[in-house]
C-alpha cells in the first residue's frame, strides 16, 4: 500500500467507527458487543428458525455452531431471524397461500436487515421449501460475501418395517378415505413418519433446492446433503463460519458465483435427481435477481439432454439420507461432470470450481441411489415444458413416477383446491377425466398453492393411473402421477384455463410438448370475450399487496420486478 492509498475499511465501519458513531456503539455494547468485537468484520447470520414443524426446528442450535466458526476465524457474528412457513403443515388449507408469498418476504426482510446494519458478510441458514430460494435471492440482492447453508433432511420414519416420509402420510389420507386403510394404521403412520427435526425426506422441494444451492455454487459442495440431526452437520456449520470469513477476505461475492453457467448446472441437477417442479419457479426468480436471461424453455432443453440418475422419493425407493450415505450431492455432480453436462469452470463459495469440488466425491461401494451413466433410470431428465392453446406462456410437467406420455379426456373443472379435494372424497372425479383446478395461480390464489392434498388423495385411490391433473397452481415436490402445473397465463388474468368447461376435451401430449383444449380459435376467443375477472379474494393486507405486484409463473412469480407490466401475473388483457 502506498502512502496515498486510502485506509482499508469494512462496510460495517460506517456503523461502528469514529466519534460520531458513539451512539451506535453504545447500543451495541448494551447488546453485549465489545469494542474489540466491533473492530472485526461483522457477519450477519440470517436464521429461518421457527418451532412450528420439524424443518427449521433445529436451526437455532445450528446457528450457534456457525457463530463459533465465525469467531474462531476472526469475525463477529450477529444473528437475526426472518419468517418461515411450513408447507407440510399448511398444505391443503388457506394457510398454504402464505408459502410462496413468504419467499419474497424472506428475501426482502434479510435484505433490509443486512442493508440496515451494513454487514461485511452474511450466512443464510435455511430449511423448509421457500426459505432456500428466499435466502439465496437476498444474497444476490446484497451481493456481499456470503453463503447459504441448508439445515439438512429429516431421518426417514418407519411404518410396518418400511422407510416412510411425509409423502406416505398424505397418500394414506386418500387410501383411508376409500376405506382401504384403518383408523389405527393411519394414526400409527402419523405418529412414526417424522421422527425428529429436519426437512421433508425425499427429493421434494427442500432437498431439490438444497441440491441446487450446491450446484449454483452458493453452498459449499457436500454441505447441504448432510442430514439435520448429526454431529457432522454441526461440524459443517462451524466450517461455514470459517468459510464466510475467507469469502470476506477474498471479497468473493454472489455475483461472481451465480451466473448463467451456474444456473444451468442447477437445472441439470434437478433433471438428474427427479427434483421438484418448484425448482422451475425458484430458479427463474434466482436468475431474475442477477439479471440472468432465463426462460422456461431452457429447463426443457437441459432436461432433455440430462439423464435421470437418482432413484429418490417420491417416485423412487430412497430418501435424502440414503443419498448422503451413497456419496451425497458431490456424487451427483461427479456423474454429470463425467457426462460433460456441467459447466466445469463455474466458481463456488469455496473458491474452487464445481469440477474441482466434484472430483473429490467419494462413492460408497455397492450404493444403488445414484445410477452409473451406463444405466440411467431414464435417458432424459424429469422436467418438460408444454405449450398450446391452454398454456400459451407454458406449463411444467414432471416425468417421474408415471409412464404416461399422452392423455386425452373430458375436463372436470374445479374453482379451487378445496373443491377438487372434495371431488376426490365424494367420487365426483371419474376415471379418464382431466381434473382442472384453476384460480390458484400467483395472482388468483393468491400465492399459487401446491396441490399435494389433491394429488396425494388421488394417488391413494384407484384413480391414480387413470386421471390427469392440470392447474395454474403448483405441485409439491412430493407429488407423483401425471400432473401439469404453472399453467400460464393463469385464470385470474384471463388465461384460457379460465374458460374451460366440464366436458371439454383436453389433450396432454408430452412428446409433442403440447397442452390443448379442443376448441377452435374462434370458440376460445368468444369465451374469453365473455369472461369477467372475479373479485379479488383479498382486498387488504399482504395477500392483496402480493396479488397486485406478482408476475406470471412463467417469469418466476417475482414481485417488485423490472419485468414490463404486460407480463405481470401473465395478464393478456
Curated annotation (Swiss-Prot):
InterPro entries: DHAD_IlvD/Edd, Dihydro-acid_dehy_C, DihydroxyA_deHydtase, DiOHA_6PGluconate_deHydtase_CS, ILV_EDD_C, ILV_EDD_N, IlvD/EDD_N
Key words, A-Z: 2Fe-2S, Amino-acid biosynthesis, Branched-chain amino acid biosynthesis, Iron, Iron-sulfur, Lyase, Magnesium, Metal-binding
Modified residues (N6-carboxylysine): 130
Gene3D superfamilies in the record: IlvD/EDD C-terminal domain-like
GO MF, one example: dihydroxy-acid dehydratase activity
Keyword Transmembrane in record: no
Pathway where this protein functions: Amino-acid biosynthesis; L-isoleucine biosynthesis; L-isoleucine from 2-oxobutanoate: step 3/4; Amino-acid biosynthesis; L-valine biosynthesis; L-valine from pyruvate: step 3/4
Keyword Calcium attached: no
PANTHER family in alphabetical order: DIHYDROXY-ACID DEHYDRATASE DAD, DIHYDROXY-ACID DEHYDRATASE, MITOCHONDRIAL
Protein name: Dihydroxy-acid dehydratase
Provenance organism: Koribacter versatilis (strain Ellin345)
